[in-house]
A protein has these predicted regions:
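Bacterial N-terminal signal peptides
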Residues: 8-16
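Carbohydrate-interacting regions of secretory-pathway proteins
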Residues: 20-200
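Positively charged n-region of N-terminal signal peptides that target proteins for export
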Residues: 1-4
Length: 200
């Protein structure tokens, strides 16, 4: 009985914390990869409270996905690109090894559509960002990305500026996890922090 009461107390406190944060819940605790799953041989580790993704010796694709699936949500992340900086944030995605089925919000070097939406192993680019928005990305500095997914409606923002807005029937049917990507080719290092989600 005591164990059940204690677990109930922990659950109640968790609900209170989420409510006090306006419904936002942290996905990264700043200490370890609890709640996440590594796909592939690329490097994912925590350093000075930051989540680091870095190319490994295989120079292959790598992913770090949430153990939990998310349907409708608003996600906020901050990232700092070093070296090539080619990465991405996937949503409603499933994995077979390092083959991912789902949708990616691009995180890439300048002039490569950061904030656009790409469908992996499917239709490719669904929407790229306008050329005049390429200067919103701050290479080598911290950037804030926000992603809102409701049904088949997806909106992305970078540093407070809306990047794309799309309605897609196939996305509406998708189910799966949120994930961060390391692109293949080597030379990639990206830092992440303040990864939080609000389920809608």
């Amino acid at each position: 009985m005591r164990k059940i009461t204690f677990l109930g107390l922990i659950l109640s406190l968790s609900i209170v914390v989420i409510a006090c944060n306006g419904g936002w819940e942290s996905l990264f605790n700043g200490e370890n990869l609890d709640g996440w799953k590594v796909h592939g041989t690329e490097k994912w580790y925590v350093e000075d409270g930051l989540l680091i993704c870095e190319s490994g010796p295989d120079e292959a694709y790598g992913y770090l996905s949430t153990e939990k699936n998310y349907d409708d949500f608003e996600l906020s992340v901050e990232f700092l690109q070093e070296a090539d900086g080619n990465s991405g944030v996937f949503f409603r995605s499933t994995f077979d090894g390092t083959k991912v089925s789902g949708w990616q919000v691009e995180v890439a070097p300048p002039n490569h559509d950061t904030g656009g939406i790409y469908e992996s192993y499917g239709r490719g680019w669904l929407v790229q960002i306008p050329d005049e928005k390429e200067n919103i990305l701050k290479m080598g500095e911290w950037n804030e990305m926000r992603i809102r997914v409701v049904g088949g409606h997806v909106t992305t923002w970078l540093n407070g500026e809306q990047m794309v807005d799309i309605e897609d029937e196939k996305i509406a049917e998708g189910k799966g996890a949120i994930a961060l990507q390391i692109h293949d080719g080597g030379g990639i290092r990206v830092k992440w922090r303040n990864i939080k989600i609000k389920e809608l």
